[in-house]
Every structure is written in structure tokens, then in C-alpha cells.
A protein has these predicted regions:
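Structural beta-strand segments of beta-rich domains
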Residues: 20-24
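Low-complexity, Pro/Ser/Thr- and charge-rich linker/hinge segments at domain boundaries
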Residues: 10-17, 84-112
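Single conserved hydrophobic/aromatic residue that forms the stacking wall/gate
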Residues: 1-9
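Short, aromatic- and glycine-rich surface loops/edge beta-strands on solvent-exposed regions
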Residues: 3, 62-75, 81, 178-191
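Extracellular/luminal low-complexity segments enriched in Ser/Thr/Pro
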Residues: 53-61, 170-175
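Edge beta-strands of extracellular beta-sandwich domains
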Residues: 75-90, 194-204
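Low-complexity "stalk/linker" and mucin-like segments enriched in Ser/Thr/Pro/Ala/Gly
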Residues: 41-52, 151-172
Length: 207
């Protein structure tokens, strides 16, 4: 029988992330999905069916994942090839202030004014990878807000979770239009279980 053309397509790009459930689409033209089999053959994680696709869950950063695809064609199992994917750690997320405007969820990313009313009604911050390719939420473990008094002295306030503390909210109330503060030293953990200190500082400009 003529060898079928094979296809193994990462749903986002040719990279898998360690400790994370990466969706993968695998298909062989002319062969029903139920007759296509795939497995990781070099021991770096697991590959399981999920709906019409697969979920790859690598374990080791820097060690490639090799996926072997076979298909049942004419009652015989044929190899469709091995596919190699690089394995990386999930990138750092960015901190946002998440709010709803006219029923539409929005994320404040800094660099423009934010209504003081929205700020006062927002419980805290979120952290996520939101770059058009990935949309992955992280759990915020803590962060710091930094205000500056009239003498230019930094006044830090620390939160031990994702929510603004009472002291932070009190500082918000005192801010006049055009004043700024900074959200920094955000600690977050992703679905890979890796805790990280984010290098990004979010500048908030109060309208």
C-alpha cells in the first residue's frame, strides 16, 4: 500500500512546556482518527488522548520530546514517523488589573489612565501569559505596591496574596488624579508548579 502522508501539528507552535498540559493535533490524511496512535518514546512525560486531539505533558526542561505516530492502514500498522519537540519552561506571566467594563472583561496593562472608581472596586491583581499564542493563568502569591509621598520618598505596602490589602486600599483613596503608583515584586505560581518572582513592574496612573 502507498505510504500515507503524515501530519503532526502543535496547536500553538513547535514547542512544548514542561509541567503543563500542551494540546497537540495529530492526523494522518486518509486514515480515521481512531486508527492513528501516538506515544512519547523517549521517556520525557506522557501523551494522552483528549477529545479529537492529544495532551502532551513533558516533565524535563531542555530534554526534547519525541512523539512516534503509527496508523492502521489496510489492517497493517505502519510507522508515520517520529516528531521532535523542544521542551521549555513556561515563560513568565505579566501582572494585570482585571476589571469589567460594560459587561466586557478587560485587563489593565499600565501606560494609560485607570479610573479611580474601577481601582477601588477591583479586589486585586492577576497574572497571566496573554500574548496571543498562550492564555495561561497563574496564581498570585503576593506583591508589593510602591507609592511616593510629597517628598519623593517611596512608601511600599505588601500584600500576602492576590488581593489588595486594607492599607493598600487606604492609599488608593488618597490618590488624586494623575498620581501614579507601582505594582512590583509579584510572586506567582503557574500550572507547572514553579514559583517565580516576576521581573515586570506595572505602572498604574489614576484618572
Amino acid at each position: 500500500a502507498r505510504r500515507q502522508r503524515q501530519m503532526c501539528i502543535r496547536d500553538r507552535m513547535n514547542v512544548l512546556y514542561a509541567g503543563y498540559d500542551n494540546p497537540i493535533s495529530i492526523s494522518v490524511p486518509g486514515v480515521l482518527g481512531g486508527q492513528v496512535q501516538a506515544s512519547i518514546v523517549n521517556g520525557n512525560g506522557t501523551l494522552n488522548r483528549a477529545g479529537n486531539g492529544y495532551i502532551a505533558h513533558p516533565t524535563t526542561i531542555g530534554k526534547d520530546v519525541v512523539i512516534r505516530v503509527t496508523a492502521s492502514v489496510g489492517g497493517r500498522t505502519q510507522s508515520m514517523g517520529d516528531y521532535t519537540y523542544r521542551v521549555r519552561q513556561l515563560p513568565d506571566p505579566s501582572p494585570f488589573i482585571e476589571y469589567t467594563e460594560d459587561g466586557t472583561p478587560k485587563r489593565y496593562r499600565g501606560g494609560r489612565g485607570l479610573s479611580k472608581a474601577i481601582l477601588m472596586n477591583t479586589p486585586g491583581i492577576v497574572a497571566a501569559i496573554d500574548d496571543g499564542l498562550l492564555n495561561i493563568n497563574f496564581r498570585v502569591l503576593g506583591f508589593e505596591t510602591v507609592f511616593f509621598d510629597n517628598m519623593g520618598n517611596a512608601v511600599p505596602e505588601v500584600s500576602s496574596g492576590a488581593s489588595f490589602s486594607t492599607r493598600q486600599k487606604d492609599m488608593f483613596r488618597r490618590l488624586s488624579r494623575g498620581k501614579r503608583f507601582y505594582i512590583s515584586r509579584v510572586r506567582a505560581v503557574g500550572p507547572d508548579g514553579v514559583e517565580r518572582l516576576l521581573p515586570t513592574t506595572l505602572e498604574v496612573i489614576v484618572n
